[in-house]
């Protein structure tokens, strides 16, 4: 087989297509969770912490004090924006929680499906024919 034929064959395998689908869905899910964190959860956290917006927290390494991060950057000061790290950690925890919830629900559904009793198998065709033969003999 040629290179492109091998490549096409590997793409057509179910595992590759499943992985591609998972990546696309994961990207979309990440955007949804990111929006939920940024637009819903972080404002609530901000209210609970007295109106603190973590993304604006920074330390200027030159030792000077600036009104905000934009002013420090305009002045050319090197800054440690630790607020962005806090925001990323919170995002990670929330995304991990949502993924855990989804996986747990999928596991429960799978266990429920496996535990569902199967209907008892009826008599086989051979058994039915034997019964008919016996009835006809009577």
UniProtKB/Swiss-Prot annotation:
Membrane-spanning residues: 9-29, 32-52, 83-103
Major localization listed first in the record, in broad terms: membrane
Bilayer disposition of the protein: Multi-pass membrane protein
Pfam family, one: MscL
Record's subcellular location: Cell inner membrane
Record-level Gene Ontology MF annotations: mechanosensitive monoatomic ion channel activity
Entry keyword set: Cell inner membrane, Cell membrane, Ion channel, Ion transport, Membrane, Transmembrane, Transmembrane helix, Transport
Chain positions covered by the region annotation Disordered: 113-133
Keyword set includes Membrane: yes
Free-text function comment from the UniProt entry: Channel that opens in response to stretch forces in the membrane lipid bilayer. May participate in the regulation of osmotic pressure changes within the cell.
Family designation: Belongs to the MscL family.
Record protein name field: Large-conductance mechanosensitive channel
Lineage, top ranks: Bacteria, Pseudomonadati, Bacteroidota, Flavobacteriia, Flavobacteriales
């Amino acid at each position: 087989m040629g290179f492109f034929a091998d490549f096409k064959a590997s793409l057509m395998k179910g595992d590759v297509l499943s992985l591609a689908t998972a990546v696309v869905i994961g990207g979309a899910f990440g955007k949804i969770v990111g929006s939920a964190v940024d637009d819903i959860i972080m404002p609530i956290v901000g209210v609970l912490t007295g109106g603190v917006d973590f993304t604006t927290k920074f330390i200027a390494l030159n030792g000077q004090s600036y009104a905000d991060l934009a002013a420090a950057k305009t002045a050319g000061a090197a800054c440690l924006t630790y607020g962005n790290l806090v925001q990323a950690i919170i995002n990670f925890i929330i995304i991990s929680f949502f993924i855990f919830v989804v996986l747990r629900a999928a596991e429960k559904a799978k266990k429920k499906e496996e535990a569902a009793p199967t209907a008892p198998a009826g008599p086989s065709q051979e058994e039915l024919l034997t019964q008919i033969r016996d009835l006809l003999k009577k």
